[in-house]
Each structure stands twice: as C-alpha cells, then as structure tokens.
Design a protein with these regions (language model features):
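N-terminal secretory signal peptides and thylakoid transit peptides that target proteins
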Residues: 1-20
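N-terminal active-site segment of His-dependent metallophosphoesterases
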Residues: 27-98
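Active-site glycine-centered loops adjacent to acidic/histidine catalytic or metal-binding residues
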Residues: 44, 88-89, 123-124, 210, ...
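Short acidic, glycine-rich surface-loop motifs adjacent to enzyme active sites
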Residues: 199-217
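Histidine-centered catalytic micro-motifs
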Residues: 207-213, 240-250
Length: 303
C-alpha cells in the first residue's frame, strides 16, 4: 500500500469505524466513546544536507526526511487530525551553524504545510546545532506556545504538556558545544511550572518529551530525572500517556496505567517504506489508541 503498511490498514480503518470493504467494524467505538482529540506525531527526522550513515551502524537517511515528513503531513491533513507534534531532533547538527539553520528552515516549511496547529519538542541534536533561542524563533508553535521551548496547551478537555530536557542536572542549559545525549534533565524552573500545570488540569493529561521517561532506555536514552517524573505523574492521577523519541528503535511500557510510548525514528532506513509516524486518538474514558504508519507500532491502552 502507498501510504501505510498493510499490517496497520485494518486497525487504522477500524479506528474510524470502517473496514477495508467500507462496512462498520465490529469493535468500532460507541457514540459516547468517540475520540475527544486526535493528533499526529513523529520524531527524530534528523534532517540535514549530509550523507547517510551506513552499516554496521544504524542507517540514518538525513536528506530523505524532507520527503518522509511530507508524507506524514499529507496523511495527517487527509485524516483531519486536530494538531501535529514533532518530538525532537528535527534537524541533524552540521559543523556550520548557517547550514544547520538552512536545514531547519527547509524542514519547518514541510511541517508548516499542515492545515492546523503545530508543536515542537527540543531534542539534543537540535540544541547541538542551534541555540535554544534561535530554534524557537525559527519554528512556529501554535497559540501561546509560540517562542517557547516548554509549554502546555489544552484541546477538548485534554491538557498537553511539552517538556524541555535540554539541561544538565546542575541547571546549565545545553547548546552548541555543550550537549550530552545521555544527560537529559529538566530545569528547576520547569519542575515548579510542571507541578502547577498538573494541579490546574481539569481532565486527562498527555506529556511530550524527547528523552524517554520510562526506565527501559538504556545508555542515557531515559532522562536522568525520569524516576521522579513518573512519581509525579502517578501522584497526579491525571496523566494517561507519555510520548517520546530519542531511542530510534522505539519501545512501549505501561507503568501504573500510564502508557510510555517511544516512537521509532523517521530518519532510520532509506525509502518511504522506512518512514515512521502515528496518529493518536484519546477517548473520554482516558483510553489511548495509537495507529502506527509504516514502521511505527500500533498500541491501545486504558488507564
């Protein structure tokens, strides 16, 4: 199939109440269990004018990410999702800051083709390429999130929280010449802010980050303060999902009823058949349904 893998077609169709033959699926949602919000998500495009890495290492097809992102945006436009979000490492760092900025402007143009709100999460490669202030100035988050690296927004009773783990444990911000992919950490100010957002949230909460927040990210793939964060999420009783990137091969864990979904990297592998992105549906009960496209895994969980 052109826009998604065959293994995901039936699940995707059923998510919208139709089978491949156009008939109602047996497990389609009841009228009172329609999604309250749907969004598209991708991560780790690592776009840049750089040659692909080759085996035995992971193949990162840097230049191809513009075409892969175009497919993602076209698909989400056709699905009419409420918004889209990228989970970091939008660009691959280049020795030349000017070339890194040119890459960011190019991939942002593709991202901005979406007919609705768009949001960004900062990754370690973004910060290695471009200072935080310049990155947020050259990208366009929707609404009050514009010009911010960490922020929250609400859509149809669901609160979404975007975290910026681009700090060292001593509070020093990461940036060009001072990044470490194994040492992601929130700033002190963000912890105070996070407590306030969770306290104010009146419904379900979904968290976006670049670093993983579950305990299974080996070798620095999980944020250093993830244990503390999971306790905060559990105590709030409001968080139903955490979406992250950073670990290019993806993963999923359910801890205390919270789904920790790590999306596979868009840049991994050559050709559109090696693309990776997903559509997420959130239901009134807190059920979360992830419909994976191409290499992305499909998952469903309930709190």
């Amino acid at each position: 199939m052109d826009m998604m893998t065959r293994r995901n077609f039936t699940l995707t169709a059923c998510a919208f109440g139709l089978s491949a033959a156009g008939t109602l699926c047996a497990d389609s949602a009841a009228p009172d269990e329609r999604p309250v919000v749907r969004f598209g998500v991708m991560t780790d495009s690592h776009f840049g004018d750089l040659d692909s890495t080759r085996p035995p290492h992971e193949v990162r097809a840097f230049r191809e990410s513009a075409r892969k992102l175009r497919e993602f945006v076209d698909t989400m436009n056709s699905r009419k999702v409420d918004f889209i979000v990228e989970l970091g490492d939008f660009v691959e760092h280049h020795p030349s800051k000017e070339k890194s900025l040119a890459s960011l402007e190019r991939i942002e143009r593709e991202f901005s083709r979406f007919n609705g709100p768009r949001y960004h999460v900062l990754g370690n490669h973004d910060l290695q390429a471009i200072p935080r202030e310049e990155f947020v100035r050259h990208t366009a988050n929707a609404g009050e999130a514009k010009g911010r690296a960490h922020y929250s927004f609400e859509k149809n009773t669901v609160t979404f929280i975007v975290l910026d783990h681009g700090y060292f444990a001593d509070g020093v911000p990461m940036g060009p010449g001072r990044t470490d992919w194994t040492k992601g950490h929130l700033s002190v100010e963000q912890w105070r802010w996070l407590d306030g957002v969770l306290a104010a949230a009146k419904g379900k909460v979904i968290v976006f980050s670049h670093w993983r927040l579950d305990p299974m990210g080996h070798g620095g793939l999980t944020a250093l303060d993830a244990d503390r964060m999971r306790e905060v999420f559990k105590k709030s009783g409001k968080v139903v999902a955490s979406f992250s990137g950073h670990h290019h091969y993806g993963d999923y864990m359910n801890i205390d009823g919270i789904g920790y979904y790590c999306l596979k990297a868009m840049c991994t592998g050559s050709g559109t058949e090696n693309n990776s992105y997903a559509e997420v549906s959130v239901y009134p009960s807190g059920k979360v349904q992830v419909t994976g496209f191409r290499r992305a895994e499909s998952k469903i969980w309930t709190p």
